[in-house]
Amino acid sequence: MRVLGIETSCDETGIAIFDDQHGILAHQLYSQIKLHADYGGVVPELASRDHIRKTLPLIEAAMQQAGCRSEDLDGIAYTAGPGLVGALLVGATIARSLAMAWNKPAIPVHHMEGHLLAPMLEERVPEFPFIALLVSGGHTLLVRVDGIGHYQILGESVDDAAGEAFDKTAKLLGLDYPGGSALSKLAEQGTAGRFVFPRPMTDRPGLDFSFSGLKTFAANTIRSQGSDDQTRADIAHAFQTAVVDTLAIKCKRALQATGLKRLVIAGGVSANKELRSQLAELMHKLGGEVFYPRPEFCTDNGAMIAFAGMQRLKAGHTTGLEIVVQPRWNLETLAPVTF
């Protein structure tokens, strides 16, 4: 079976074709970073317009890359949410139109389920059950995963997502958009221990997160300590260490509470080297394993949507003619997949 995947939830246009026997046959990605850089963040209207321009050409490129014709496809998967409503509608409309024209089923995919399943595109595939840390610009979730569609949210951010906090703090430090990766690079030049940031919500029981206070703490530190190059690097180092420590502490709590020994990390922030290093060390101490996608599949992409769509297609989870998106969509409401 082959599935075309379409990802347009935010500021990346991702297209891929996944074959259940041969894996990823094609992968095309266009990033809108330059488009939004002058604004310091994603402008929804501009994002939607750019998806309109890029989606069909990227689909054509993916079909050529895979040597695939419409009759070779078994379904068309698209991100139906969560995300920016206009951007989601572009992908959903194109996917639904192609499905109708080619007489193929359309498969709506939850964006975070795509991220959650992305490590299954690698050679080392996690077995169920496991704990998943989904950490991106829009979400920070700790999820118990007993199977595809069998999700229990154990903890989530009560305010800013971790990736959002990275980007906002990077902006305070005068770094270009998107700031998360730039902040991590700057942190490499920082001096450990000069500044110590709090580890939010780790002084109480529970698995929820809060990162908005770290941005405020960073702003106050910049205001009081100045913004010379070394100070900025030291602040970046302290901020990143606080976020990574907080994520690791909550992961450890979730693993100990459930007794599970497998941890999956996914989403854009899962590409962070310090986070990967600390969670690898944690799982080594706990006698467990950690799994994550290759860096190109940490950020939004069509491959994860094609793969998740394949699982849903096999379970018969397709839609009719309606074009429906869900800008807000609780992961726990997804139907379980049984083959």
Curated annotation (Swiss-Prot):
The keyword Transferase applies. It is an enzyme of class 2 (transferase). Keywords: Acyltransferase, Cytoplasm, Iron, Metal-binding, Transferase, tRNA processing. InterPro entries: ATPase_NBD, Gcp-like_dom, KAE1/TsaD, Peptidase_M22_CS, TsaD. Coiled coil: none annotated. Its EC number is 2.3.1.234. Fe cation binds at residues 111, 115, 300. It catalyses: L-threonylcarbamoyladenylate + adenosine(37) in tRNA = N(6)-L-threonylcarbamoyladenosine(37) in tRNA + AMP + H(+). It is found in: Cytoplasm. This is tRNA N6-adenosine threonylcarbamoyltransferase. It comes from Tolumonas auensis (strain DSM 9187 / NBRC 110442 / TA 4). The gene is tsaD.
